[in-house]
A protein has these predicted regions:
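A conserved acidic beta->alpha catalytic loop
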Residues: 36-45, 95
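Cell-envelope/extracellular polymer assembly enzymes that use nucleotide-activated donors
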Residues: 2-4, 31
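Donor nucleotide-sugar binding loop of glycosyltransferases
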Residues: 12-15, 39, 98
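Short, well-formed alpha-helical segments that are part of the catalytic scaffolds
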Residues: 12-25
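Conserved small/polar residues in nucleotide/adenosyl-binding loops
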Residues: 184-189
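Acceptor/aglycone-binding surface of glycosyltransferases and processive sugar-polymer synthases
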Residues: 61-82, 87, 99-178
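Acidic helix N-cap motif at the loop->helix transition within catalytic regions
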Residues: 17-18, 41-50
Length: 189
């Protein structure tokens, strides 16, 4: 089974190399697709250099200008499907998601779950590098989504998700709109 991790970046030169090392040190083999939105800090150049070490498993898509997280994920989903991946995961580069948990996300998806959402709030709060205001906004937004949708999601704004190929092929990605971590579909006729 081929597994891809999509990591959108913008000014992540302080984190990208450590993230690459961490993902490629996991006991499960993952390929990594970095989608950089024209980072002025040189993030893409670091990835280009690191591709010399991982030419078959580290991929880079460079986009001009800051086009946004949602469109980066959609671009990554299309790229992953076009390149034959069976599972496609998404995560942030700033280590607010623990890369070690990629293995657990994949294993849960491989058990027959089409979408597996990682949570920072299952056992207390597991978030680093966030100001309290952002943490509270995320926590209460997730609580709101859980109440309104009656879905047992602990972290609706996680952005740490593993999708099966089947789940993504079921969506019309051209009709999907994403704003940050929120995914919208359209049935416009």
């Amino acid at each position: 089974m081929r597994k891809l991790v999509i990591i959108p970046t913008y000014n992540e030169k302080e984190n990208i190399s450590a993230m690459i090392d961490k993902v490629f040190s996991l006991p499960e083999p993952f390929e990594l697709l970095v989608i950089d939105d024209g980072s002025p800090d040189g993030t893409a150049e670091i990835v280009r250099q690191r591709r010399k070490e991982f030419p078959e498993t580290l991929h880079l898509l460079e986009r001009s200008g800051k086009q946004g997280l949602g469109t980066a994920y959609l671009t990554g989903f299309r790229w992953g499907l076009d390149n034959g991946f069976d599972y496609i995961c998404e995560m942030d580069c700033d280590f607010s998601h623990n890369p070690d948990d990629l293995v657990r996300l994949y294993e849960a998806a491989a058990e027959g779950n089409d979408v597996v959402v990682g949570s920072r709030y299952v056992q207390g709060v597991n978030v680093v590098n966030w100001p309290m205001s952002r943490l509270l906004m995320s926590y209460f937004a997730s609580m709101y989504v859980r109440i309104v949708t009656r879905m047992p999601l602990r972290d609706a704004t996680a952005g740490f998700v593993c999708y099966s190929r089947h789940a993504l092929e079921t969506l019309d990605l051209d009709a999907v709109r994403m704003k940050g971590c929120l995914l919208y579909t359209s049935d416009a006729a």
